[in-house]
UniProtKB/Swiss-Prot annotation:
The chain crosses the membrane at residues 18-38. Its EC number is 3.4.21.-. It comes from the Eukaryota. It is a single-pass type II membrane protein. Serine protease. It comes from Homo sapiens. The lineage of its organism: Eukaryota, Metazoa, Chordata, Craniata, Vertebrata. Glycans are attached at residues 72, 107, 315. It is found in: Cell membrane. Residues 1-17 are cytoplasmic. This is Transmembrane protease serine 11B.
Amino acid sequence: MYRHGISSQRSWPLWTTIFIFLGVAAILGVTIGLLVHFLAVEKTYYYQGDFHISGVTYNDNCENAASQASTNLSKDIETKMLNAFQNSSIYKEYVKSEVIKLLPNANGSNVQLQLKFKFPPAEGVSMRTKIKAKLHQMLKNNMASWNAVPASIKLMEISKAASEMLTNNCCGRQVANSIITGNKIVNGKSSLEGAWPWQASMQWKGRHYCGASLISSRWLLSAAHCFAKKNNSKDWTVNFGIVVNKPYMTRKVQNIIFHENYSSPGLHDDIALVQLAEEVSFTEYIRKICLPEAKMKLSENDNVVVTGWGTLYMNGSFPVILQEDFLKIIDNKICNASYAYSGFVTDTMLCAGFMSGEADACQNDSGGPLAYPDSRNIWHLVGIVSWGDGCGKKNKPGVYTRVTSYRNWITSKTGL
């Protein structure tokens, strides 16, 4: 005979029930807290925009120096975008906007934009609508003279990495702006990461010897006198990054090309090209500087910047971090005065600094860049650190190789 079992029901102890309740409540609390945090805390968002300009063809792919007409258009668009967003209901969320490229097409030109905003994720959909509407309004009300087509505006969200890729191949673009004001490389201040991403350290047998400027993924521009007695390319490497001996990237040198008329005594035609054995990969901290057009003219008192890892004073110590300073262009007539350089500065050279001796490059800054910003704050290589009498002396400013005088020579050797 089979006997049916008798099941008995047992209740949970009170403390177990309380423990389970508190555990579930804690999980719900954390979940709700994370959700609120995710929806409320601001994040940075990146957008790529495009619109059409009819009837006029522009060609600025951002990889080379732009024409004056393209620069004027890009500057006007950027100014109008800045004004439009700063005077809108989303001015608090607005961070930055810029023109990336102007590309020709069959009926005119396409303008490529990059925009940056910061807002809570919950506002993503509505924010994109507001941004696009503001761009449409800007084109309709303020861009008629440029033949902009408001209906052509497109806007899409992109990742931070995609945003960086838009500008990494562009020349002369900084990631970070400089923060110094009126200090000098001699006893100067350190630069920020990404402020001068084209600056390179020419290392001879593993030690910093000269500076150079990255002008393409394979070529650098430097001073011929750096290599006059050290011309074996196998002895040279190139470091990129603001810390001279802890580089982001290092490359071997394949070839060094001197100017054919380089003269050591007077440092005439003090310019050299350095060809890398392997291309560099552009990043936000390693970028090329724009080469100027041969017809670019600088005026007295124009602002320029010199950078380098040279000594902090004559026969002094070397910095670890890249140094920077703002200088002024000095007219060659002043530089050639009897109390200055007495006619030794030729038309293929330029002077920069202060006659009072406030700022200067110094030893082992040779070959480094003298950079000039255009109206859009895009930087052009206008000079190469060449020579001077001491460092920061009164009436003895730095003398630089004038890059515009050698544009045809650079093109003949590199195709740039």
